[in-house]
């Protein structure tokens, strides 16, 4: 079980990413555009650097929705491998069962 502070930190990051997503996208479009002048590009780079560090989606970490475990996370289910196995054995995941061949 992850510390509640780590779960809260990830929730805060998710909120910041959502808040600054449009602004980051607009600045990145200015930076990557070949028609932008060097001065405008440099201003956009400085503005992008001034945004909060946690507003970048690359700083988010996928975590298990039940335990907060960061490793062994399966994106399709939103659970860690351990909790997915437990739920599968209880028959709570439709269409998923233990392999046997």
Curated annotation (Swiss-Prot):
Keywords on record: Ribonucleoprotein, Ribosomal protein, RNA-binding, rRNA-binding
Annotated InterPro entries: Ribosomal_uS14 (IPR001209), Ribosomal_uS14_bac/plastid (IPR023036), Ribosomal_uS14_CS (IPR018271)
Gene Ontology cellular-component terms listed: cytoplasm; small ribosomal subunit
A GO MF label: structural constituent of ribosome
UniProt-listed SUPFAM superfamilies: Glucocorticoid receptor-like (DNA-binding domain) (SSF57716)
Keyword Ribonucleoprotein: yes
Cross-referenced Gene3D superfamilies: 1.10.287.1480
First and last residue of the signal peptide: none
Gene Ontology biological process terms from the UniProt entry: translation
HAMAP family assigned: Ribosomal_uS14_1
Record function comment: Binds 16S rRNA, required for the assembly of 30S particles and may also be responsible for determining the conformation of the 16S rRNA at the A site.
Entry's family note: Belongs to the universal ribosomal protein uS14 family.
Assembly and oligomerization: Part of the 30S ribosomal subunit. Contacts proteins S3 and S10.
NCBIfam families in UniProt: PRK08881.1
The protein, known as: Small ribosomal subunit protein uS14
Organism per entry: Shewanella piezotolerans (strain WP3 / JCM 13877)
